[in-house]
């Protein structure tokens, strides 16, 4: 299906371009979200008549996004979550959680603007891209920790998930002897 793009769409094209896409993608995403029009003769004429307005509106949105990007780029946000000793979270951190934390800090960012391929499931520092506008993208750092003290340690570069290394002999167990005893017991039964 041919559509006319009303704004820049990543990996597809710039505003005003006529592109050929699959019908489902056009109907369910591009047309539904107002990012494109069907490429009919009437729509082409309508688009050309309104092109200046659309470009002005796009430029205004990009400038607003650029202003927010200057303040947001490189910022670090702390999320406190419960996790096991190995650093694996009970649950995960999704775009909704990220949007809440960033909004509490005074930035206007929606959950759909965060680019996460999969939810975050471990403690530590994670760099997350934020697409404020199709032409403006910044990166923020999310510090996921079990407590504010741990977050400070992680920010300094310390690992909070180091497991203590131990040897079975240090525990007072004689592995060889335990196996030998188990083997003798098996002979007595049979």
UniProtKB/Swiss-Prot annotation:
GO CC aspect terms: ribonucleoprotein complex; ribosome
Keyword tags: Ribonucleoprotein, Ribosomal protein, RNA-binding, rRNA-binding
SUPFAM superfamilies: L9 N-domain-like, Ribosomal protein L9 C-domain
MF-aspect GO terms: rRNA binding; structural constituent of ribosome
Superkingdom, natural source: Bacteria
The keyword Transferase appears for this protein: no
GO biological process, one term: translation
Keyword Ribosomal protein: yes
Pfam families the record matches: Ribosomal_L9_C, Ribosomal_L9_N
InterPro entries, alphabetized: Ribosomal_bL9, Ribosomal_bL9/RNase_H1_N, Ribosomal_bL9_bac/chp, Ribosomal_bL9_C, Ribosomal_bL9_C_sf, Ribosomal_bL9_N, Ribosomal_bL9_N_sf
Family, as annotated: Belongs to the bacterial ribosomal protein bL9 family.
Function (record text): Binds to the 23S rRNA.
PANTHER family per the UniProt record, alphabetical: 50S RIBOSOMAL PROTEIN L9
Protein name, UniProt field: Large ribosomal subunit protein bL9
Protein source organism: Methylorubrum extorquens (strain PA1)
Gene encoding the protein: rplI
């Amino acid at each position: 299906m041919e559509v006319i793009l009303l704004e820049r769409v990543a990996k597809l094209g710039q505003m005003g371009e006529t592109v050929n896409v699959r019908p489902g993608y056009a109907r369910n995403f591009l047309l539904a979200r107002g990012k494109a029009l069907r490429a009919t003769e009437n729509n082409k004429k309508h688009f050309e008549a309104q092109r200046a307005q659309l470009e002005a509106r796009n430029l205004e949105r990009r400038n607003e996004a650029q202003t927010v990007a200057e303040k947001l780029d490189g910022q670090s946000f702390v999320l406190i979550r419960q996790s096991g000793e190995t650093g694996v979270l009970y649950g995960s951190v999704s775009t909704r959680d990220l949007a809440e934390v960033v909004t509490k800090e005074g930035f206007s960012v929606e959950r759909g603007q965060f680019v996460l391929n999969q939810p975050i499931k471990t403690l530590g520092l994670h760099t997350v891209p934020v697409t404020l506008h199709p032409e403006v993208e910044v990166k923020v750092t999310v510090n996921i920790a079990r407590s504010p003290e741990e977050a400070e340690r992680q920010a300094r570069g310390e690992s909070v998930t180091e497991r203590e290394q131990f040897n079975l002999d240090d525990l007072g167990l004689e592995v060889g002897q335990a196996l030998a005893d188990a083997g003798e017991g098996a002979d007595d039964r049979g």
